[in-house]
Amino acid sequence: MADKNKRPPRIDLKSPDGKFGRLMQIGGTALVVLFAVVLVFYIVTSHDKKGGGATAGAIRVTSSKLVAQPGTSNPKAVVSLYEDFLCPACGNFERGFGPTVSRLIDIGAIAADYTMVDILSSPRNDNYSARAAAAAYCVADESIDAFRRFHTALFSKDIQPSEVGKTFPDNAKLIELAREAGVVGKVPDCINSGKYLSKVDGLAAAANIHATPTVKINGTEYEWSTPEALVAKIKEIVGDIPGMDTAATAPAA
């Protein structure tokens, strides 16, 4: 008969003194570190190209060279743009300043926050402002790079309709332009379902925007005049970083 007092030795998993305990601690630490590395990699790669946005409905566009405030990841200069895709002044602004803003983004001088608002929609224009703005958010969900191309295309002379015109791009055309910008994915369903129509409807009021284009630099409204003046203003904030001297780019044709 076995002696009830003779029990098999127990392995104390909590004890750091035993060899097995030390192995468990080392293994657990390694797993935690590995998980952290994988998580950081996922966050960085997901944020890099997938849709993104900033706050209050803005689509944030940056580059990996972004000049940040010391000790933080916050940009030194944020240019906020509030635009309506049907607005003729917005078209003029983008064709005149768009290449320079894009260049400032690429050299890391600014983060650009694009808020596409609906001010000019009406049944007469098939609610184009709202549909185009909502489509831009659909594209941004899939790719920020594609959003940049889509945004530029919709303000081009060949595509932007006249505010008093009789024909306006339908959803099929917006989907085609999104495809040409480099995305398909969920964009067609997003556009056709009107996923972001209610969102864009209230963006102008939420930001207290009454006219487009409105441009702000670090939250203060900026009276734009020339691309050179814009570059000079940004240079005051971030300094003379590489590429700044050639950032004022010729207007788009």
Q: Where does each model-flagged region fall?
A:
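Extracytoplasmic low-complexity, Pro/Thr/Ser/Ala/Gly-rich segments
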Residues: S46-G108, Y114-M116, R124, P242-A253
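Short acidic/polar alpha-helix capping motifs at helix-coil junctions
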Residues: N5, T62-A68, V139-A140, K166-P169
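A general structural signal for short secondary-structure boundary/capping elements
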Residues: A58-R60, N127, D158-Q160, V183-V184
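C-terminal cap of thioredoxin/glutaredoxin-like
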Residues: A2-D48, I175-A253
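Short low-complexity stretches enriched in small and charged residues
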Residues: L39-F41, L66-T72, I110, F168-E176
